[in-house]
Amino acid sequence: MMSNDLLVTDIEAEARTEENIWHSDNSALAAPPAATTSASQDQLPDDRYLNRESSWLDFNARVLALAADNSLPLLERAKFLAIFASNLDEFYMVRVAGLKRRDEMDLSVRSADGLTPREQLSRIGEQTQWIASRHARVFLDSVLPALGEEGIYIVTWTDLDQAERDQLSTYFNEQVFPVLTPLAVDPAHPFPFVSGLSLNLAVTVKQPEDGTQHFARVKVPNNVDRFVELANRGAVRDTSAGDEGQLIHRFLPMEELIAAFLPVLFPGTEIVEHHAFRITRNADFEVEEDRDEDLLQALERELARRRFGSPVRLEIADDMTESMLELLLRELDVHPSDVIEVPGLLDLSSLWQIYGLDRPALKDRAFIPDTHPAFAERETPKSIFATLREGDVLVHHPYHSFATSVQRFIEQATADPDVLAIKQTLYRTSGDSPIVLALIEAAEAGKQVVALVEIKARFDEQANIRWARALEHAGVHVVYGIVGLKTHCKTCLVVRREGPTIRRYCHIGTGNYNSKTARLYEDVGLLTAAPDIGADLTDLFNSLTGYSRKLAYRNLLVAPYGIRRGIIERVEREVAAHRESGPQTGKGLIRLKMNALVDEQVIDALYRASQAGVRVEVVVRGICALRPGTEGFSENIFVRSILGRFLEHSRIIHFRAIDEFWIGSADMMHRNLDRRVEVLAQVKDSRLTAQLDELLKSALDPFTRCWELRPDGQWTASPQKGQQVRDHQESLMERHRSR
């Protein structure tokens, strides 16, 4: 669990000006203080938005705070270091790349908070240099020593004895040397292409004959383990426990091993220097869908181009010489402002390998999801269809098992001879997806199967293309959605013959049909046989597979046409109901739980609700551009963020005065509301809305461990040190363990 005394290391003073606050030590990066902002009724000030890029970096800083929290199990802390690194990689590949493109094209479109692309890039560079250094220091000064205390060592070549060096010499010659390609640079050998996110050694070699020096590059193979484990040499003994304890693990980074054998790679030369470096390339591309008849081929062409995207970041070891850096800047065409200098190891995303060690005592207590009570097998197992005919079911993953609910729903539909058709959207799915295999089996059994596979899902394009082809080969009707839009909704429709009638069964969720991430992501889903939702999903799939453009639905809000308008309309209705009931009753309440809150129109609607006296409570995992708690326009808005063992991924919206609960796939962002097909469904069953209400109350409990957003844009750990505290996710796990 996250400690209230956050970031407990010697360097935490760099990160704070007072207890429990994270922010950059550069005051120019801070958002305007609340005192500079005021507004009268129905007026909204110009500085009402927080910068979305800075807000994202703040989110990643909260992830880093978990890594620095010494109350968490040690390998969980290493995992959060890896997550931080992967997050930052993607941020540069997409967000920074997009800002650079706009800056280079002189598209001086300002952000909602008034910054040009260049100003944002400057701010990002300063913030990133600070937080990347902090990331490295948390590893070097806190996590790495703690690993050593538990018998897990990441060592250097100089730490090894002769027996270990002999062992690694054999390993290098047999397993590593054959796959390495040293690339020298001279008039006959141009500077080599450096692939994005690859780890490399920049080497200077000297010719003994004339003393001339040449640059060479060695790529660290990405198809072998980053950390080479040495043979176990003993055990950590816990004499008080009376057992032998755990084996000692000693790892050498692969780049250290290669560096030790550079003379083997460059025989007859003197190795003058070597330094690690890594570049990040632009991976933000678009397919001109309206100009290409074959979207699949167009996407594959763009994927091939992605690896040649322009560099957007150069990470270097902090011991790199100026001359070596100047050469890399020149040859890679990188601006000095895009250089991130890192002490210690580059690319800590590789710590996933260390997390994979079989050391359960250093990880979170195991949690096994339970089967939803409605689907639990008793004396006579009942089909999911029979259960849904009795009433709707709300599943909450990972606390409820995905395999025994959503996955079983689709598998039963596949095996049921009375099922005529299955229609499903697929955005991201697992590599050995049981969902996709079930759809293939259904098609081979003669059922009508439609799969909308979103092949433009970023960084999952290749996997989705493979699945699309496998589905087509099995006879599934595969479509790629609507031109110009990504299909991000999570929907499944099963059509079943029941006597003389046809009944439709549906699933609408907030998370992907991915059995692996369903164990790690927190999501909710509605399983129902309600006729109005069945009719809505029929219309939606007809719109996705045909040329119809359905705009109004019975029980759904559908982007890109209906969600923003529908949410703002309900905010306005909540305000009206609040006024009608009398502001003193405090009836007006809007609660939102989501991944990101950025859309200016939705934010402005919430500001106006606050001005009318409606209380607004927001639980946001990542980006939040809304400035809460400011007199005159947002004093009734409260924002918090919950991070922990599971990734909080569900989207839930509640309007108390008008008594409506909505769940679905959409965050309040431009891309979700304007450039994606998203679905929000209203949950009407009082049993289910009570469950959603309980979930929101737990997340918003004053004693729940969280981060709270201040008017100046800084995030504060809450509750404060010494106060009673509860963990939202742990509370839910204990409730399910006790069943």
UniProtKB/Swiss-Prot annotation:
Swiss-Prot/TrEMBL catalytic activity: [phosphate](n) + ATP = [phosphate](n+1) + ADP
Keyword check for Transmembrane helix: no
Residues engaged in binding Mg(2+): R428, R458
Post-translation changes: An intermediate of this reaction is the autophosphorylated ppk in which a phosphate is covalently linked to a histidine residue through a N-P bond.
CC cofactor: Mg(2+)
Gene Ontology CC: polyphosphate kinase complex
Keywords, comma-separated and alphabetical: ATP-binding, Kinase, Magnesium, Metal-binding, Nucleotide-binding, Phosphoprotein, Transferase
UniProt superkingdom: Bacteria
EC nos: 2.7.4.1
PANTHER family linked: POLYPHOSPHATE KINASE
HAMAP family xref list: Polyphosphate_kinase (MF_00347)
Name of the protein in question: Polyphosphate kinase
Gene responsible for this protein: ppk
